[in-house]
Amino acid sequence: REYGSGGHDVGERVAEKLGIVLYDKDDLAEKLKSLGDYEEVKSFYEERPANSLLYVIAREEDRKMNEKPFEQIKSITENQSCVIIGRCANVIFRNEEEHISVFVHADLEKRIKRIAGTNRISEKEAELLIRETDKRRDEFHNQYTGENWGDSRGYQLSVDSGMIGIEQTVQLICDYMEAKKWWRDCGRQGI
């Protein structure tokens, strides 16, 4: 989700509407801390990409290291319906038939107004914060997946929450889930 698009709020409301668990980076990190598995994957939960020079030199080792947090997320969430905010979940669960991946985005001006209002900062500060956060998320996603963050081909659904609002975004996601369930239950008959 783009920073300031309301993606976290959307995820919370979808989880609430469906009566399922929500996991964001803090929830997952807390779960791992309680299991004693946090320290070795700390940078994953802090959204810190590796140093770019080290990244190039140790790419193969990074791939092995990257598998660990993915395996942990699968283990934490297995056998339950849940909403996962971020954490490259679109890639982690890509081959799971039951998963739905959504990218929530919005026009920069709307995101600036939202962040300035919620954080009580100037619009100039909000824009800087948005650009820094989006850049960090892009680098993080690219490092851990090798894919471009926000590329619609990496998600089943990409929604502009700035155009339709948070509540309609939630409803659109729930409607999509119902349509996907219908399609699966009908045996995927061609149109």
Annotate each language-model stretch with its function.
Residues 70, 166-174:
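Short, amphipathic alpha-helical "lid/cap" segments that border enzyme active or binding sites
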Residues 86-90:
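Short, polar loop motifs at secondary-structure junctions
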Residues 27-81:
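ATP-dependent small-molecule kinase phosphotransfer cores
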Residues 1-14:
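Glycine-rich phosphate-binding P-loop
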Residues 47-51, 122-167:
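Small-molecule kinase domains that catalyze NTP-dependent phosphoryl transfer to phosphate-bearing small molecules
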Residues 95-118, 123-133:
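Conserved phosphate-donor/acceptor-positioning beta-strand/loop module used by diverse small-molecule
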